[in-house]
């Protein structure tokens, strides 16, 4: 070996040693320089696990006071990010949806749903085509097609509430299930064998994503244990087969009516006709239809339960709704969808129910698909992100000092109309008086301009526009491409249910069996089932509001049958 070649060899050897060492040092320095969002200190291995209760939205909201709008946690090695302000939530989940629109993997849910249950599906080709197909039959432009069905079911629900003195939650659940079943499958649920199978699967799927439901979520190697040894895997696989058979059977019944030309507008019928257009397999179309039943029934039941609770806890709000109905509809006919635009306080009541008591207060989970930086903080790939809906919907800086209370009047402008709102959904723009956002004195010009309010910083908006112009709505339907597909249909159902019940009935607290006095509920109390919040009671006394109410209700039902 010559001196020159020997020197070259040593230089190459030195480079081979130094370059990796420098890279490791650089990577370590980079990690040190990464500034993670603030958050409470945890303990080794478990992190912040033991700092959370069965109501994590309460701890998340408390963290906001100490750490600010972003809170970073670690749960057994899994990074969590909590967003506690509208600005942070919309910045990340709306504007940066490409990074934050995925869902974290749930091993149990994967076996249970085969990746076909849209709310839990990972971002990818299957999720995308299911989402597009669902949107085609649930967007705002087609929601009106289902209003006849919703009107009939609202009349039936009002009738049952008047006839039966107890079992309110059961009545609300059966009504929601019947209405959505009719919309999806063009036939009301008979309460037969389909009903318990749907409810059983709903319970199973909610458990599947509940923390600590199975050790497999924290010990991924357990997924490779044979099903005959792993009871959780066996039950999940059986659940997938049973629910698939159920949904395929329901879809087949609709297909027969479509072939015979004997069907009315329905989501399943539309999916059958356009299945090839959307690239869906029969199993995917069946699961998409079944998903609509599961999600729609539970969320509608919860909203209706909170409606009854609010009406007995805040009787003055009930009376104001009824006064508006008397002024607009009168007492000679039932309210219809034709009255919707003329009932601003009733519509504000819907918005306030959804704001005041969101069904999932902690928000649906999002998942980062790559590293990101926000406001100087590093958010690593693989972080589970929660938009803390409870904190967002109860922010006193936006909704006022009474944000914890039920008050539809916060959405009524000085002229008595429904205020335009920072969208409760992600739909389009709102017409607002045109002026420069930096000029708070330019409200006189009559020119109107469309502004996408979703992407305006809410605190900036509130400081520039008076409350009579707009008040933010709610974020209970979610964010970005993960926003609830059926929100327009849900809003229609709530409107006609609220209107029918309040027009025909008076709602008052149930009598306490021990004291003989009305059992008025605590205005701020609630219970929780897993990550859902429910009223402490739905029992109440429902009576005809005036002498002719039951007769007009019966006549209207007969005409609609």
Curated annotation (Swiss-Prot):
It is an enzyme of class 1 (oxidoreductase). Pathway: Secondary metabolite biosynthesis. One of its GO terms (cellular component) is membrane. Its main location: membrane. It comes from the Eukaryota. GO terms for molecular function: heme binding; iron ion binding; monooxygenase activity; oxidoreductase activity, acting on paired donors, with incorporation or reduction of molecular oxygen. Heme binds at residue 484. Induction: Expression is highly induced during artificial growth in symbiosis with Populus, which is close to its natural condition. It is a single-pass membrane protein. Belongs to the cytochrome P450 family. This is Cytochrome P450 monooxygenase iboC. The gene is iboC.
């Amino acid at each position: 070996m010559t001196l020159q070649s020997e020197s070259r060899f040593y230089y190459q050897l030195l480079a081979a040693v130094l370059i990796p060492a420098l890279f490791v040092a650089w990577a370590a320095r980079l990690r040190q320089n990464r500034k993670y969002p603030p958050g409470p200190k945890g303990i080794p291995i478990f992190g912040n696990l033991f700092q959370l209760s069965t109501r994590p939205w309460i701890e998340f909201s408390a963290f906001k006071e100490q750490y600010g709008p972003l809170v970073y946690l670690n749960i057994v090695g899994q990074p969590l990010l909590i967003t506690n302000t509208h600005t942070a939530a919309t910045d990340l989940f709306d504007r940066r949806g490409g990074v934050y629109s995925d869902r974290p993997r749930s091993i149990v849910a994967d076996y249970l749903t085969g990746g076909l249950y849209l709310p839990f599906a990972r971002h990818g080709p299957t999720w995308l085509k299911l989402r597009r197909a669902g949107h085609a039959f649930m967007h705002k432009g087609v929601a009106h097609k289902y209003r006849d069905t919703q009107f009939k079911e609202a009349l039936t629900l009002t009738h049952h509430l008047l006839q039966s003195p107890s079992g309110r939650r059961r009545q609300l659940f059966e009504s929601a299930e019947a209405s959505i079943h009719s919309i999806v499958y063009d036939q009301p649920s008979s309460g037969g064998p389909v009903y318990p199978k749907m409810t059983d699967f709903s319970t199973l799927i909610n458990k599947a994503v509940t923390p600590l439901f199975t050790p497999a979520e924290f010990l991924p190697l357990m997924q490779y244990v044979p099903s005959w040894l792993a009871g959780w895997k066996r039950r999940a696989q059986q659940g997938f087969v049973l629910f698939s058979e159920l949904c395929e059977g329901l879809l087949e019944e609709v297909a027969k009516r479509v072939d015979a030309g004997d069907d009315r507008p329905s989501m399943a019928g539309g999916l059958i006709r356009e299945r090839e257009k959307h690239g869906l397999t029969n199993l995917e179309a069946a699961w998409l239809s079944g998903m609509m039943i599961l999600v729609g029934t539970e969320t509608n039941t919860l909203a209706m339960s909170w409606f009854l609770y609010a009406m007995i806890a805040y009787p003055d709000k009930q009376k104001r709704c009824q006064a508006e109905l008397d002024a607009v509809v009168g007492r000679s006919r039932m309210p219809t969808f034709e009255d919707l635009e003329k009932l601003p306080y009733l519509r504000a009541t819907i918005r306030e129910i959804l704001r005041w008591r969101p069904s999932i207060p902690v928000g649906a989970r999002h998942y980062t698909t790559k590293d990101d930086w926000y406001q100087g903080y590093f958010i690593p790939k693989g972080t589970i992100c929660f938009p803390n809906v409870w904190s967002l919907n109860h922010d006193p800086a936006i909704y006022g000092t009474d944000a914890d209370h039920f008050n539809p009047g916060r959405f009524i402008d000085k002229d008595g109309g429904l205020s335009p709102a920072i969208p409760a959904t992600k739909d389009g723009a709102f017409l607002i008086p045109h002026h420069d956002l930096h000029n708070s004195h330019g409200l006189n010009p009559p020119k109107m301009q469309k502004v996408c309010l979703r992407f305006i910083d809410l605190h900036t908006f509130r400081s520039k526009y008076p409350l009579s112009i707009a008040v933010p709505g709610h974020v209970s339907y979610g964010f970005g491409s993960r926003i609830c597909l059926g929100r327009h249909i849900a809003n229609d159902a709530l409107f006609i249910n609220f209107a029918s019940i309040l027009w025909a009935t008076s709602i008052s607290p149930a009598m306490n069996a021990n004291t003989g006095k009305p059992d008025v509920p605590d205005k701020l109390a609630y219970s929780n089932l897993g990550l859902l919040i429910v009223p402490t009671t739905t029992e109440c006394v429902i009576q005809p509001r005036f002498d002719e109410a039951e007769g007009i209700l019966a006549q209207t039902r007969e005409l609609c049958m």
